Amino acid sequence: MIELAVIGGGPAGLTAALYAARAGRSVAVFEGSGFGGQITLSPLVENYPGLGAVSGMELGDRMYAQAEAAGAELTFSRVQRIERNTDGTFLLETEDGAISARAVIFAAGAKPRTLGLPGEEALVGRGVSYCALCDGPFFDGQDVAVAGGGNTAFEDALFLAGRCRSVTLIHRRKTFRAEQALVEQAAQRKNLTILTDMVITDLHADNGELEHLLLKNADGRETRLPVSGLFVAFGRVPDTEMAAALAERDQEGYLLTNDRMETAAPGFFAAGDCRHKQVRQLTTAVSDGTLAAVSACRWLAEQ
């Protein structure tokens, strides 16, 4: 029996483990894909206070090392199921066996929806991005495209239009899911072009960097769009299915918490991109992890 199990080894989970371990709690972090989370895919991180410019991989490695040095047990094993024991503790079934914990911090994150095109994954960090706020500054003065038709796509396009030479928003339908006010704002930007009834069929790279997109309209006609950046804004999918029986979720599947990261289930906390919130950034994930750990430690002390 451990005191605290953390599911997910990204910035939120590693921060939670760091704080809980420093508070003297026995902590185990379970991660099935790779410690550090999605930030490790970023070639350069410039918006984490105090570090200047650092690669995402180096930042993830530093977080891992710091949590481990504090005394957290970091286990490369995927949690497959969580259930509540009759005594109120939690049973976690992992790839390597079962373990019980008095409290759980769920920080499994959320994955971006992709285009699903060949070569897309290889171009992440080399022209393809799923976060305009994170990576937009790397494309100042360049020609970029945004794929999507919802609020996020238009917000990204407007943000990028303020710093890029040109922005092309590409949507597969004639109508948008975005609020009309955002659509009207985008239509007024001189360096922002909106293409409808259009899909991206191919990503062409030159020397490993995105060079142009191949587009196809409803009539099957293909066109070539030269861009150095593509921001895919199809939304994200939270990895919360295994927590559905324990905690409440919103319509998109994100876990609902209060400002102390507590879910409706006593002793079950959530942190990072998997929970319902307005902004999903590296710094907000770290903040969530801190709050979740402090709340979990207080909860453990009260039991």
Can you say where each PLM-predicted feature lies in the sequence?
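A Rossmann-like FAD-binding core segment of flavoenzymes
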Residues: 67-94, 98-101, 162-259, 298-302
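FAD-binding core/adjacent interface of flavoenzyme oxidoreductases
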Residues: 1-7, 23, 28, 74-142, ...
